[in-house]
Amino acid sequence: MSSLYVKLGILAAGLMLSGCMQSTTFEATNQTVFKPRDKELLAKVSYVKTPVPEAFRRAIVDYHRKEAPGSIVVDSDNHYLYLVQDGGKAIRYGITVGEEAMAWSGIAKIGSMTEWPPWHPTPGEISRLGVPKFVAPGPDNPMGSRALYLYSGGKDTLFRIHGTNQPEYIGASISSGCIRMTNEDVIDLYNRVKMGTIVVVLEPKHGDSPFNSQMALQGGGNSIQ
């Protein structure tokens, strides 16, 4: 029985570190966010539209960190991305985390935004995955329906938040890639943010460490219009 209490305590601590408490309101996708091209291409996907586990469905949750409303916060450890709202709330999205996502942390800004982006694989990806140097935009492109390109100090960090053609991995860590969201969720996020939005990428495996807490104080954010 004592081991059960220990497990429950660990779970509660994880929820605290991920910035959410018990209040959770799941959000259905508003179909008005989809443009005609979105509807056309999403209808053509060849991958299986695996339902996202309930824990990683888009939801409005209580949020207790200090980032300003309008900021994006990426919590790689818990596979969540938060869009901070007013009133101690945030929109929480489930994400897939890859090695590239675990390799960078800090504060960035959205420096570019693209609908249905092409994919330019890195030399390592070309060698490892056997993919071409260029993959055109489309329903089965690994970049998915939207991409947010993160910049720091005026330079591209090579860190992206984008859609996916593998929604079955939402809530998981995989061998490569940046931050992936379902195509529907990344469209929703894309429509809520703008160029210059602050993105705080928490240091993996450190939870609410002094480093991450200091980033929270530095993160500015932009109010959602």
State where each predicted segment sits:
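N-terminal pre-domains immediately preceding structured catalytic cores
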Residues: 2-8, 14-225
